[in-house]
Amino acid sequence: MMGRNDDAFHPLLHSTPESSVKIPVPLVSVGRESSQSKGNMKTAILIWLTLQNSIHTLLIRYSRAREVDAMFVSTVAVWLTEVIKCFICLFLVAQEETPRRFIHALRTQILEQPYDTLKVCIPAMIYIVQNNLFYVAASHLDAATFMITSQLKIFTAAIFTVIILRRSLNRTQWFALAVLFVGVSLVQLQGTKAKESSGESPFVGFVAVVVACCLSGFAGIYFEKILKGSAPVSLWMRNVQMAVFSIPASFSAIYMQDSKTVNEYGLLYGFDSIVWLTVLWYGVGGLSVAVCIKYADNIAKNFATSVAIILSTIGSIFLFDFIPSFTFLLGASLVIFSIFLYSSHQSMVAALGRLRGEIPSTKEAFCL
């Protein structure tokens, strides 16, 4: 039993006058509050990821498929998205530092380390091309097909993981990738049978998604290699470094692709509340990876993706008169199944790593 002096150093232990029994009531209360707080946070993140994935898909499709007098220029939307992301990241970096240290951090980590900043040039450029391709895909595919087909990024990320990072996949993961490929193919069958109307081409949309997913897979794995092989820099600062290249590159793409329209009507031609909402949602959603890293595990991420696929399908039915066929529903089910199957091995490895006190890899942390 502890002596009187020892008790003085344990304020959480309550001793009654009648007995020397210590009752750690406050400790239990604190533990319950902490557990409840974590549970509430995970629930909030789960809801956010689900809404972000589904609403983003429906918004980008609706902004491109609706009938309007003036259609906005997608390259301008991509550029504004990069600007918004940069300002958000600068704000978050500034919140972590005093104004003086904030300016010092920008100078030392961007200007005084040009080689380190130059490393993110490749993924920054790739993400610009990828985002432009996603707008092309959204112009030719319904929201549900677009959402499901874009899950090919899991397949491409896995392939580049084997090629670039020299990691091996087990049989379960290879089987999951095969199921994913079959599921996407079945979903695309409905798209190829659909009538091409209003200048839409499901084949063009599918090719755009496939190329975008290949670029996304390569950029994600390349970015992981940068993070693991470079000096420690916060994720927000890395995004600021990428903005150094992505903002001028995306602005150049405007005049390379849509100079005639922009020169005649201006940058904000066709922009209305729906377009601005799409751009803002795209910008905030692009930073959701940081939320995944800090709070969400693979199970939460995959559940959010699966529910988002279902919500996107339901939204497409009501907003775009989309009628899913049996092959579409079968393909969607296979895609959802493959997502959980592929990550089940990763979740197990991550759990073992935590038990051993290891740091999870960026591949586990990033929402690929």
From Swiss-Prot:
The keyword Transport applies. Keywords: Golgi apparatus, Membrane, Sugar transport, Transmembrane, Transmembrane helix, Transport. The keyword Membrane applies. Changing R100K: In e2797; no obvious morphological defects, but in combination with RNAi-mediated knockdown of nstp-4, has misshapen gonad arms and accumulation of oocytes. It comes from the Eukaryota. Acts as a transporter of both UDP-galactose and UDP-N-acetylglucosamine into the Golgi lumen. Apparently transports UDP-galactose and UDP-N-acetylglucosamine simultaneously, and independently, by an unknown mechanism. Functions redundantly with nucleotide sugar transporter nstp-4. May be involved in gonadal development. It comes from Caenorhabditis elegans. It is a multi-pass membrane protein. The chain crosses the membrane at residues 72-92, 118-138, 145-165, 174-194, 203-223, 235-254, 273-293, 317-337. GO terms for biological process: UDP-galactose transmembrane transport; UDP-N-acetylglucosamine transmembrane transport. Belongs to the nucleotide-sugar transporter family. SLC35A subfamily. This is UDP-galactose/UDP-N-acetylglucosamine transporter srf-3. InterPro entries: Nuc_sug_transpt. GO terms for cellular component: Golgi apparatus; Golgi membrane; perinuclear region of cytoplasm. It is found in: Golgi apparatus membrane. Disruption phenotype: Worms display altered surface antigenicity which prevents bacterial adherence. This is due to a deficiency in both O- and N-linked glycans. Expressed exclusively in pharyngeal cells g1 and g2, lateral seam cells, spermatheca and vas deferens. One of its GO terms (molecular function) is UDP-N-acetylglucosamine transmembrane transporter activity. NCBIfam families: nst (TIGR00803).
